[in-house]
Amino acid sequence: MRVLGRTGLKVSSFGVGGYHAAVPKEEAESIALVHRALELGVTFFDNADCYQNGVAEERMGKALEGRRKKIILMTKVDQRDAAGSLKTLERSLRRLRTDYLDIWQFHGIRSLKDVDQIFAPGGALETAEKARKEGNIRFIGVTGHADPQVHLAALKRYPFDTIQMPINVLDPHFKSFRKTVADEAVNRNAGVIAMKTLSMGKILSYRVATVAEALPWVWSQPVSVLVSGCESVEQINYNVYLAKTFTPMPEDEQATLLARTEPHKGTQVEDYKRSPES
């Protein structure tokens, strides 16, 4: 278990990504996947209002029913205004079958305009702070994967409890969140949530690294929890196995791995880092 920054929450080092958990065609498969994660001791569950047009939240809500107090539940909102974000929050609570969220994050900030909209009068931050006072959410976070400078700008404007970003074996070579944001987040006591840990599977399909190399490298960075998309019970089993057998990767091994991955840097594999204009 690791501590999620200033929240003080103790979380499993591996977290289930909500988007991929809802990929299986049959709902029963998604529920079985979540139940298996629970059996193995996973306590952190990621989601977003927009994932699979709401199906991801609905399936996770069914799977976690009766187990809510044993886990840390996070979801995200894309709307930047107060009114729209309030409707989204209410919808997420209904789908997830809960009356509160442990963490609610502003989803996918890509530009300073996004940040300005969230903080503007009538912006989504107003909804988040009101919901926190009323007990509908416990902590406020922010996510994004396009530009580390936007993450830094958000951190400097508000004491976010959590911040979610791409951290993987390619990230240090190009528009790096690990080098630019992660340490600053830790200095500000924000819980760091790693995502895109396999670059949406492209680290595997491009043969950049194996899962057994890629995930331990991420856990060796200053992260509280690694979120990875799993679409089968077998993938859950293997990822949790890696989490439970993890030992910090020596610096020389990290350097060797990064030297090997460097030729793959850029947006061909990390395509989510393309600028908003491209």
Task: Give the residues covered by each predicted segment.
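N-terminal binding-site loop/beta-alpha segment at the start of enzyme catalytic domains
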Residues: M1-I71
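Conserved, mostly hydrophobic/aromatic
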Residues: L4, V16, F45, M60, ...
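Acidic (Asp/Glu)-rich catalytic clusters
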Residues: G5-V11, L38-E39, G61-K69, E90-D99, ...
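Active-site mouth loops of central-metabolism enzymes
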Residues: G17-A28, M74-G84, V115-Q117, I203-A209
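Active-site beta-loop-alpha junctions enriched in small/polar residues
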Residues: Y19-A21, A48-C50, K76-R80, F106-I109, ...
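Structured C-terminal cap/extension of enzyme domains
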Residues: A28, R36-L38, T43, K179-S278
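Short catalytic-loop micro-motif centered on adjacent basic/acidic residues
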Residues: T43-Y51, M74-K76, R138-V142, Q164-M165, ...
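Glycine/proline-rich, positively charged
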Residues: R80-V169, H173-F177, V186-I193, E234
